[in-house]
Regions:
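Catalytic cores of nucleotide-sugar-dependent glycosyltransferases that transfer UDP/GDP/TDP-activated
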Residues: 1-394
Length: 394
C-alpha cells in the first residue's frame, strides 16, 4: 500500500526526549516499511526515517524555539504538504494525518476536499488547549463542520467514548499504540531498589503524588521528565510542589532522558508510578514500561484499565494510599508476564496491521460515499475494565 503520513512539525521524528505522538509516528512508519508498504513522510528535515521524506522546514519548530502559539508556522507545513498531495494524488492509496495540538486543526478544511482516502489519528484530548465550554462561535462551527467529514481513529476505547460525549466526532475505529520490542532488553530478574516516574512535569501527570507515595512507602524515587520553561503554571508547579522535595537521596530528579536512557531506567526499576489526574487518552509510558518488564501502578483514569490487568501485570489504584499498598506488593508481579502482554497486544507489528485494516476500510468508504459518515465500532464494546483482563488470560 502507498501511504502518506503528514506529521506535526513541532517535534523531531523520532523525538530526542519527550514527544509521544512523534515516537508513535516514527514506530508506525518504520514498521509499515518493514511490512512492505511504500511510505512517504511529510516532516521537517531533522526527522530520521527510512521513508521517502518530503520537508518544508530544515528543523522541527521546537528545535528553532518556535512556541506552540505560532500556528502560522504549522499551517505552512500542513498547507504545503496538502498542496503536494493534490499534485501527486495518483501516487498514493491513503493519507494518514495526526492530530495532537490545536494547530493541527488546520488540517480539517485542507484535507476534506482531497480525493484521496484518509484517516486521522486523534492523539490527544480534543479540543487540546481550548476550553470545551468555549468551543463556540462561527470559527469553531467552521472547523467542526469539516471535522465531521474526516474519519478519525481513537487510540483507546475510553478516548472514543470520552470525546463523543462532548463532540460529534466521526470515529471509525480504535487502534492502540504499539512499541518496537527490539528497543527493550528482556525483563530483569533482579530489578534495582527504586521506583520511577516518567513524563512531563505538569500537575495532571501527578509527579507530586508519586513523591508522596514514595515518601510514605519509604522507597527511593527517580523522576525523569521535561520541564517546559515557557509556561508559568508549569514553572510554578515545579517550584512549589516538586523542587522542595528533591533531596538527591530518596527523591531524585534527573531531567529529560532519551528513549534509550528511559528504557534502561524502566528495565532496572522495581516499578513505574503513574498517578495521572486527567482522562489520558492512552499513556505511552505504561506500555513502554511493560515492554521492559516493569510493572506499572497507575491511577484508574483514562485508558489505564485497557492496558493494565490489575494484580497480574501491575496495579490499578484510586488514590495515594492504595498506591503505597501496591508498591509493597510489586515484587509479586511476574515481569515476564508483563512483557508478554505487550508482545501479544501492544507491539508495533500489531499496531501497523490494525492500521492497514483501517486504511482498507477508509478506502471502501471513499468509494461508496462522497462524505465520510460515522460507522458502528467494529469490535464488541466490552467494558474497559475487562479488556486488559481478557488479554492476559488469552
Amino acid at each position: 500500500m502507498r501511504i502518506a503520513h503528514i506529521a506535526p512539525p513541532w517535534i523531531s521524528i523520532p523525538p530526542r526526549n519527550y514527544g509521544g505522538t512523534e515516537h508513535v509516528i516514527a514506530t508506525l512508519v518504520e514498521e509499515q516499511i518493514a511490512q512492505g508498504h511504500d511510505v512517504t513522510l511529510f516532516a521537517p528535515e531533522d526527522a530520521k526515517t527510512s521513508a521517502t521524506q518530503i520537508a518544508f522546514f530544515p528543523r522541527s519548530l521546537f528545535a528553532c524555539d518556535v512556541p506552540w502559539q505560532a500556528h502560522l508556522k504549522a499551517y505552512y507545513h500542513l498547507h504545503k504538504s496538502v498542496d503536494y498531495l493534490k499534485e501527486h494524488v495518483q501516487d498514493f492509496d491513503i493519507l494518514h494525518t495526526h492530530l495532537s495540538s490545536a494547530a493541527d486543526m488546520y488540517l480539517f478544511p485542507l484535507t476534506a476536499a482531497l480525493p484521496l482516502p484518509q484517516v486521522t489519528t486523534l492523539h490527544g484530548q480534543f479540543p487540546f488547549d481550548r476550553i470545551t465550554t468555549e468551543w463556540q462561535g462561527d470559527a469553531d462551527r467552521y472547523y467542526m463542520e469539516w471535522l465531521s467529514r474526516i474519519p478519525l481513529v481513537a487510540i483507546s476505547e475510553h478516548a472514543r467514548r470520552f470525546e463523543q460525549e462532548k463532540f460529534p466526532l466521526n470515529f471509525i475505529d480504535v487502534v492502540y499504540h504499539g512499541v518496537d520490542l527490539k528497543d527493550f532488553a528482556p525483563p530483569s530478574t533482579a530489578p534495582e531498589d527504586f521506583f520511577l516516574w516518567v513524563g512531563r512535569l505538569t500537575f495532571e501527570k501527578g509527579a507530586h503524588l508519586a513523591i508522596e507515595a514514595a515518601r510514605k512507602a519509604g522507597v527511593p524515587l527517580i523522576l525523569a521528565g521535561i520541564l517546559d520553561q515557557n509556561i508559568p503554571d508549569v514553572q510554578r508547579y515545579f517550584q512549589e510542589r516538586i523542587e522542595p522535595e528533591i533531596d538527591g537521596r530518596q527523591i531524585t530528579y534527573i531531567g529529560p532522558v532519551s528513549p534509550h536512557e528511559r528504557n534502561d531506567l524502566l528495565h532496572r526499576a522495581r516499578g513505574l508510578l503513574n498517578p495521572i489526574l486527567w482522562e489520558e487518552p492512552f499513556g505511552m509510558v505504561m506500555i513502554e514500561a511493560m515492554a521492559a518488564g516493569c510493572p506499572v501502578i497507575a491511577f484508574r483514569r483514562g485508558a489505564a484499565e485497557e492496558i493494565i490487568a490489575s494484580g497480574k501485570v501491575g496495579f490499578l489504584v484510586n488514590n495515594v494510599a492504595e498506591m503505597v499498598e501496591s508498591m509493597q506488593k510489586i515484587d509479586t508481579i511476574d515481569r515476564t508476564l508483563v512483557r508478554r502482554s505487550i508482545e501479544t497486544h501492544f507491539s508495533a507489528q500489531i499496531m501497523a496491521e490494525n492500521y492497514t485494516r483501517v486504511y482498507k476500510q477508509a478506502i471502501r468508504m471513499k468509494r461508496n460515499t462522497k462524505l465520510f459518515v460515522p460507522l458502528a465500532p467494529a469490535r464488541d464494546q466490552t467494558s474497559a475494565g475487562n479488556l486488559a483482563e481478557d488479554r492476559v488470560l488469552q
